[in-house]
UniProtKB/Swiss-Prot annotation:
Annotated Gene Ontology cellular component terms: cytosol
Protein name (Swiss-Prot/TrEMBL): Leucine--tRNA ligase
HAMAP family in the cross-refs: Leu_tRNA_synth_B (MF_00049_B)
Motif placement: 'HIGH' region: 41-51
InterPro entries linked to this entry: aa-tRNA-synth_I_CS (IPR001412), aa-tRNA-synth_Ia (IPR002300), Leu-tRNA-ligase (IPR002302), Leu_tRNA-synth_edit (IPR025709), M/V/L/I-tRNA-synth_anticd-bd (IPR013155), Methionyl/Leucyl_tRNA_Synth (IPR015413), Rossmann-like_a/b/a_fold (IPR014729), tRNAsynth_Ia_anticodon-bd (IPR009080)
The organism of origin for this protein: Thermotoga maritima (strain ATCC 43589 / DSM 3109 / JCM 10099 / NBRC 100826 / MSB8)
UniProt keyword terms in alphabetical order: Aminoacyl-tRNA synthetase, ATP-binding, Cytoplasm, Ligase, Nucleotide-binding, Protein biosynthesis
UniProt short sequence motif 'KMSKS' region, positions renumbered to this chain: 580-584
GO biological process, one term: leucyl-tRNA aminoacylation
Principal localisation: cytoplasm
CDD domains assigned: Anticodon_Ia_Leu_BEm, LeuRS_core
Residues that hold ATP according to the record: 583
Molecular function GO labels: aminoacyl-tRNA deacylase activity; ATP binding; leucine-tRNA ligase activity
Domain of life, per lineage: Bacteria
Length: 824
């Protein structure tokens, strides 16, 4: 028998696929289109099996859809700009581009070894000039349409990465990438006006029926829509007004203090001269605190009384103005009305600073005494101490108070979003340069489209100074104004790498087009992506930004669709020793080592067999060994059968007995089940179980029936359908089997195996015979037998007679197709 040598077989078939351009995708076809896409990787080094999981999932989908008659687009590329490349330059003295290209070459080789069906002619890297030229073009489209702007802003600053971070890149007050505590700086920065799209980004989530609900919930929470009122509180002895946004205008009568965010410009405006020094000390102390943790209910509340008062517009009362550490500029207006009786953070603050507590909402069943309250009452209730609204249920009061405020001209209805504009400036080198020029005479001038790309210079010093390395490169910085021709300077910040990945799925359509980012006809044929696959960690950032950029390009007339991804699948992680794989933990499993030891087909099947693909799974060496044993058993079974079926076909197949009928029924029912498993939610683990079950049934037949009685036509049908169903999961093995069955064509070019509904019909059924509650016998009978005939057959069986002879039968119960119950 031929020996299984996976490395030889896999290399051979990968070369055949490449040579014959099997996965090259034509732009147009008579077939329906299917765009299968896996999130592209950041090329930081080598891939581990956790990364490989989603590429394998994507490949099953692409290969299956190809066999179902679709024109499949299945491309690959690299999210190649970013901080680690620059950090490598600083630490190891290697140029970011060289480091990146080396890693890309490694990843490409790793992915090819897996036998993934990518159209390599469409490969992209976001650091290629032919790519980032169009990232810059997208920036210009946003700029021209008022969606890109520059302003001085309090920004998140990572002292270690020496760059600005978007809000989304800060987790619990720490830099998402390096874990350093984030500080605040005031810098001139570029923003994209994503807030203009907040309502559409929110509402259109309802259109995304092919997305997991938890991902949509994460986006809804991030956008964070709140409906309430904006109210102006006049500052005593001044023309200044403090505007607050509140979702609880029904509590206005309970306001006993105002609080400003430490970052609010009003703080400097309102502080009296004699308090400035003391205030500065307070602000310095607060700046050291974790900005995001300081807002939590549990965090220690700190405040500074400014010595100024505001007037409550509904009661006319004087209320003290504080600066408070738990207020952030990011939310609402950066100022709040303090209602200690009905907000826990305000309650803690008021208790600490001796501020009065005034109850204005009481539960229906009891009164509240402010002196005895140990925590705020935040529930619904009846409005009290609230002037004209006394006795109003608070649930109705919100709407009534807003209407009243508008009538009186004190406030107005308002919708606010937690979402903030997307900060895209980065003070780093390895990113797409922002295509803007500054001219003393003409001001801010966009680079003309015909002058794109603004190229990154190669000869740059990578000192982590907190300024972009480009700001020290005179050759890059100095330029001519495209309007007046005078001396000018380039913008030296580069774009957030999330800008690069916000449109890459559009570029795969025409990856090497020189005069535009994509052909409108092609992009509107292929997009939206039919199936997008990637980690849930990108639920907010990448997916939200991609939706935003797609909507902008749609509104500007470049796209016919305004949502980029029809279906989204988020795969689970692979853990080792109970933890996420990482080099620092030393628990990384290398796909290269697994392929060397077991072959890519075993690795692919094990990754899919471990657990449902959306679930996290623990890597097990014993588990991959078990799958490898199955693969070898499959190989041996196939080559045992091959000599008997190689010259055979399946025409005029005759089934001679019930064993053959049952075997063929199992074949077709398993093919049906595997098809349903793939179609109905990517149940790849149970699909592979189906393949294993089929091999078991085949082995049982071969072992129990003499060779000379084997039904060769039936065996030919089984190994053919088995090979076809195997091919998305273990494509190299399937190609070898298909070739050795005498086919000149490739298995990847075949249709998915069909099942015969007639073969699924059961002609005979095994019935258990239970006497007084215990199974005593079994009988095989025609499936449509009448109860009368069945009773006669059962009572004539010797084994049954032993228990019932001479005894009156009280009951004879038949559960159709399953069991007979006799009570004597």
């Amino acid at each position: 028998m031929k020996e299984y040598r996976p490395q030889e077989i896999e290399k051979k078939w990968q070369e055949v696929w490449e040579e014959k351009k099997v996965f090259y995708t034509p732009q147009r076809s008579e077939k329906p289109k299917y765009y299968a896409l896996v999130m592209f990787p950041y090329p930081s080094g080598t891939l581990h099996v956790g990364h490989v999981k989603n590429y394998v999932i994507g490949d099953i989908v692409a290969r299956y859809k190809r066999m179902r008659g679709y024109n499949v687009l299945h491309p690959f590329g690299y999210d190649a700009f970013g901080l680690p490349a620059e950090n490598a330059a600083i630490e190891k003295g290697i140029h970011p581009e060289e480091w990146t290209r080396k890693n890309i070459a490694t990843i490409r080789q790793q992915v090819k070894k897996l036998g993934i069906s990518y159209d390599w002619s469409r490969e992209i890297a976001t650091c290629d000039e032919e790519y980032y030229k169009w990232t810059q073009w997208i920036f210009l489209q946003l700029y021209k349409n008022g969606l890109a702007y520059k302003k001085k802003a309090a920004v998140n600053w990572c002292p270690k990465c020496k760059t600005v971070l978007a809000n989304e890149q800060v987790k619990d007050g720490k830099c998402e990438r390096c874990g350093t505590s984030v500080t605040i700086r005031h810098l001139e920065q570029w923003f994209f006006k994503i807030t203009d799209y907040a309502e559409r980004l929110l509402n259109d989530l309802d259109k995304l029926t092919g997305w997991p609900e938890h991902v949509k919930t994460m986006q809804r929470n991030w956008i964070g829509k709140s409906t309430g009122a904006e109210i102006d509180f006049p500052v005593e002895g001044s023309d200044t007004k403090i505007r607050v946004f509140t979702t609880r205008p029904d509590t206005l009568w309970g306001v006993t203090f105002m609080a400003l965010a430490p970052e609010s410009p009003l703080v400097e405006e309102l502080v009296p001269e004699e308090k400035k020094e003391e205030l500065q000390e307070f602000l310095e102390r607060v700046k050291q605190q974790d900005r995001f943790r300081r807002t939590s209910v549990e965090a220690e509340k700190e405040g500074f009384f400014l010595g100024r008062y505001a007037i409550n517009p509904v009661t006319g009362e004087r209320i003290p103005i504080y600066v408070a550490n738990y207020i952030l500029m990011e939310y609402g207006t950066g100022a709040i009305m303090g209602v200690p009786a009905h907000d826990q953070r305000d309650f803690s603050f008021a208790k600490k600073y001796g501020i009065p507590i005034k109850v204005v909402i009481k539960p229906a069943d009891k009164d509240l005494d402010p002196e005895k309250m140990e925590e705020a009452y935040e529930g619904e209730g009846i409005m009290v101490n609230s002037g004209p609204f006394d006795g109003t249920p608070s649930s109705e009061g919100i709407e009534k108070v807003i209407n009243w405020l508008e009538e009186k001209g004190i406030g107005k209805r308002s919708v606010q979003y937690k979402l903030r504009d997307w900060l895209i400036s980065r003070q780093r080198y390895w990113g797409a340069p922002i295509p803007i020029i500054y001219c003393e005479k003409c001001g801010v001038v966009p680079v003309p489209e015909e002058d794109l790309p603004v190229r990154l210079p190669k000869d740059v010093e990578f000192l982590p100074t907190g300024q972009s390395p480009l700001s020290f490169h005179e050759g890059f910085k100095k330029t001519k104004c495209p309007v007046c021709g005078g001396e000018a300077q380039r913008e030296t910040d580069t774009m957030d790498t999330f800008v690069d990945s916000s449109w890459y799925f559009l570029r795969y359509v025409n990856p090497h087009l020189e005069d535009k980012p994509f052909e409108p006809d092609d992009v509107n044929y292929w997009l939206p992506v039919d199936q997008y696959i990637g980690g849930v960690e990108h639920a907010v950032l990448h997916l939200l930004y991609s939706r935003f950029v797609t909507k902008v390009l749609h509104d500007l007339g470049y796209l016919n669709f305004d949502e980029p991804f029809t279906n989204l699948f988020t795969q689970g992680m692979i853990y080792k020793d109970g933890a996420k794989m990482s080099k620092s933990k030393g628990n990384v499993v290398s796909p290269d080592e697994m392929i060397e030891k077991y072959g890519a087909d075993t690795l692919r099947m094990y990754i899919l067999f471990m657990a449902p693909p959306e679930k996290d799974a623990e890597w097990s060496d014993a588990g991959i060994e078990g799958v490898h044993r199955f693969v070898k058993r499959l190989w041996n079974t196939f080559y045992t059968v091959l000599p008997f079926v190689k010259e055979e076909n399946t025409e005029n197949l005759v089934l001679k007995n019930s064993t053959e009928k049952e075997l063929r029924r199992k074949l077709h029912s398993i093919i049906k089940k595997i098809t349903e498993d793939i179609e109905g939610g990517f149940k790849f683990n149970t699909a592979i179980s189906g393949l294993m079950e089929l091999v078991n049934h085949l082995s049982q037949y071969l072992n129990s029936v003499p060779q000379e009685e084997w039904n060769r036509k039936l065996l030919r049908e089984i190994v053919e359908k088995l090979t076809l169903a195997l091919s998305p999961f273990a494509p190299h093995l399937a190609e070898e089997f298909w070739h050795d069955l005498g086919n000149d064509s490739l298995v990847v070019q075949q249709s998915w195996p069909s099942y015969d509904p007639k073969a699924l019909e059961v002609e005979e059924v095994e019935i258990a015979i239970q006497i007084n509650g215990k199974v005593r016998d079994k009988v095989v009978v025609p499936v449509d037998i009448s109860e009368e005939d069945l009773k006669r057959i059962v009572l004539e069986r010797e084994r049954v007679k032993e228990y019932v002879d001479g005894k009156p039968i009280r009951k004879f119960i038949y559960v159709k197709g399953r069991i007979v119950n006799i009570v004597v």
